[in-house]
């Protein structure tokens, strides 16, 4: 891949990492508060269904994961397994699409 | 007088360590030990050195598992008891015994555009660079590299990705990126970007930890990451 392309992928991974740092912290805090607050699954769904805020938050979370994780796997494949080039790139792109699809389905299931 | 038990790598990549016994002295360097073996015990031992005072970068070897400049490394600092293990630098092909082929190391410096590209001619006046300017200070911080290869041998990313330019080449590129007289900034940033360049660095800082000149290639590489990002966003890569 060209220097420009690689640099853009690096920017994408670092930017998504910054987003994930915030999203993971908010998610963990939310889960902890929900569990310690004694909320049932029905209570939680009552708060998330129809909420544009939670849909936007977890939508961004899923988007960041689907960018960040495949790029990390691409690096692992390159450095640890010596897999470089179009093959691993295509595999990581498919993983990105799969993560995005599964994640957005899960977000839709709890917010729509 | 005590005796050092020294294991020294002999042969090429498929060689093995051989045992030697060397008299131990005060203020003895690892290079002194290797020289004693070659001059008093086994003249077929191949190793490389020149200045013996930490200027030329020729005598780097792996000492007890870590790359070091041997002329400025005292035995007392690195010996485990009375034991030393001395081998060739890692991440480079072994020519014989303690001598490595450093061609790839220097070739990568050229791949990283590590050569100054002047913008002025001999008829122009001297460039005036303020010593306190940010660019000059950044260049100063990286400029004292002696090309010993210790950082390259220590780098995990070089071991994982043989195409990776390595800390020394990127450190040199950072010096030139900050040289206001240089005219190849754009080409240089393109040369050092990507998965074989600065973006492959994991910031383990092993190069910085091992650099005998106390430079920080890690900081230089971080600088290159920043500059290549801005160049990419401006469409200059």
Predicted regions mapped to residue ranges:
Chain A
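Membrane-embedded alpha-helical bundles that constitute the cytochrome b-like, heme-associated redox core
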Residues: 1-112
């Amino acid at each position: 891949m060209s220097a420009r392309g690689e640099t853009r992928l690096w920017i994408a991974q670092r930017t998504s990492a910054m987003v994930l740092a915030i999203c993971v912290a908010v998610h963990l805090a939310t889960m902890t508060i929900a569990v310690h607050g004694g909320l049932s699954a029905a209570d939680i769904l009552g708060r998330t269904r129809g909420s544009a805020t939670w849909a936007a938050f977890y939508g961004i979370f899923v988007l960041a994961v689907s960018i960040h994780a495949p790029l990390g796997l691409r690096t692992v494949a390159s450095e640890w397994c010596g897999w470089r080039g179009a093959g691993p790139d295509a595999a990581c792109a498919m993983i990105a699409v799969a993560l995005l699809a599964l994640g957005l389905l899960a977000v839709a299931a709890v917010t729509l | 007088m005590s005796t050092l038990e020294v294991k020294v790598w002999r042969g090429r990549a498929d060689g093995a360590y051989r045992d030697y016994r060397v008299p131990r002295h005060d203020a003895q360097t690892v290079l002194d030990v290797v020289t004693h073996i070659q001059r008093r015990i086994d003249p077929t031992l191949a190793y490389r050195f020149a200045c013996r005072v930490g200027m030329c970068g020729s005598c780097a070897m792996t000492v007890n598992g870590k790359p070091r400049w041997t002329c400025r490394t005292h035995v007392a600092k690195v010996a485990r008891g009375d034991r030393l293990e001395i081998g060739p630098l890692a991440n480079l092909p072994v020519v014989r015994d303690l001598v490595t082929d450093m061609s790839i190391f220097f070739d990568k410096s050229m791949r990283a555009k590590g050569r100054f590209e002047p913008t002025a001619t001999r008829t122009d006046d001297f460039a005036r660079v303020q010593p306190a300017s940010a660019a000059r200070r950044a260049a100063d911080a990286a400029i004292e590299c002696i090309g010993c290869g210790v950082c390259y041998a220590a780098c995990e990313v070089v071991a994982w990705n043989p195409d990776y330019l390595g800390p020394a080449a990127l450190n040199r590129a950072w010096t030139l990126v900050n040289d206001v007289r240089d005219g190849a900034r754009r080409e240089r940033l393109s040369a050092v970007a990507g998965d074989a360049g600065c973006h492959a660095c994991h910031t383990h800082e092993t190069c910085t930890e091992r650099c005998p000149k106390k430079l920080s290639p890690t900081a230089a590489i971080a600088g290159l990451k920043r500059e290549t990002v801005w160049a990419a966003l401006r469409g200059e890569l």
